[in-house]
């Protein structure tokens, strides 16, 4: 009899250990068309409140007990995806979402519910993607990220046609600007008319107007965290544009398919060349040359060793060229 009780107790203890075992589901969420990681994608279990969001590298992780689950992944602008799985051990689940176009018949604007700005954890954070910035009306054909930020609440320009911003009354030198975690000290071209950020190379922008994370310091007003695109990991791609005063070209290519990629994006103004050519063709001395032009280049190489380790090298090079000659006047 005692032996039966001991055996029963052992079986109950073993069953509790088996059914109480916890395992981890983790992986990356990517764009199915080009392999770009999706930041802030929602990953949760269907029919429950258990879930998480992807971090700045598109990575997510969920710790669950063993059993059957339906994992749901959603992201704005992409089709919803559901995956059924049986969890019996640590599992790697990489998810690819297909972009989706949604046509809206009308737009309804409503006020936020009462006290929503108090209970929200991110009430001082604004997020913009390159697609959103592209939709904003541009100056002389040039999409400008800083000009877009100036349209947000609590942000204003520091001067007419200036790429500097003042956040909640602070000075332009009180803003911390980061490009792939590297500090940008001078963010303007052409005397402040244009910013140094080429939107074709930017993935997303986060503006912290308050409640700045503790790992960032040295500024009083705001944090502007800019992330560059990783590049297309599936196929070679390119895009470009011609504006009134400048042209730009972006090239993306996989180094190793679905493992590594590289992106190059450059632009240059040519108003100086156009005016010089017009002066030469017309033969008139009344046309004054434009003594200013700028060019810049963004580059990034990215390689993923495995789901937990990746390395990237990003860089920016820009130059403003100003030349002016003073002729002699005979009196």
Indicate where each model-derived feature is located.
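Membrane-embedded beta-strand positions in outer-membrane beta-barrel channels/transporters
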Residues: 94, 106, 146, 164, ...
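Outer-membrane beta-barrel translocator domains and adjoining extracellular loop/strand segments
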Residues: 275-281, 315-318, 323-330
């Amino acid at each position: 009899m005692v032996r039966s009780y001991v055996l029963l107790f052992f079986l109950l203890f073993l069953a509790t250990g088996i059914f109480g075992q916890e395992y981890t589901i983790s992986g990356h969420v990517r764009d199915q068309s080009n392999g770009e990681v999706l930041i802030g994608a929602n990953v949760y279990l269907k029919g429950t409140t258990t879930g998480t969001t992807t971090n700045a590298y598109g990575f997510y992780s969920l710790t669950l007990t063993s059993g059957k689950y339906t994992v749901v992944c959603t992201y704005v602008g992409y089709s919803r995806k559901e995956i059924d799985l049986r969890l019996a051990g640590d599992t790697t689940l990489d998810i690819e979402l297909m972009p989706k176009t949604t046509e809206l018949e009308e737009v309804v604007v409503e006020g936020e519910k009462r006290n929503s700005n108090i209970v929200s954890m991110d009430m001082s954070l604004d997020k913009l993607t390159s697609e959103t910035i592209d939709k904003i009306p541009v100056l002389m054909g040039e999409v400008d990220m800083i000009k877009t930020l100036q349209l947000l609440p609590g942000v204003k320009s520091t001067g007419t046609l200036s790429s500097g911003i003042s956040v909640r009354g602070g000075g332009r030198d009180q803003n911390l600007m980061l490009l792939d975690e590297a500090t940008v000290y001078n963010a303007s071209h052409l005397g402040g008319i244009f910013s140094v950020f080429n939107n074709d190379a930017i993935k997303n922008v986060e503006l912290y107007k308050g409640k700045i994370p503790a790992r960032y310091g040295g500024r009083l007003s705001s944090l502007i965290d800019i992330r560059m695109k990783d590049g297309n990991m599936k196929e070679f791609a390119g895009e470009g544009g011609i504006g009134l005063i400048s042209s730009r070209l972006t090239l993306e290519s996989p180094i190793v398919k679905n493992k590594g990629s590289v992106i190059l994006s450059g632009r240059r103004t040519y108003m100086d060349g156009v005016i010089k050519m017009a002066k030469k063709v017309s033969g008139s001395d009344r046309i004054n040359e434009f003594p200013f032009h700028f060019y810049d280049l963004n580059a990034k190489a990215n390689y993923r060793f495995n789901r937990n380790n990746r390395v990237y090298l990003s860089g920016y090079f820009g130059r403003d060229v100003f030349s002016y000659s003073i002729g002699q006047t005979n009196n």
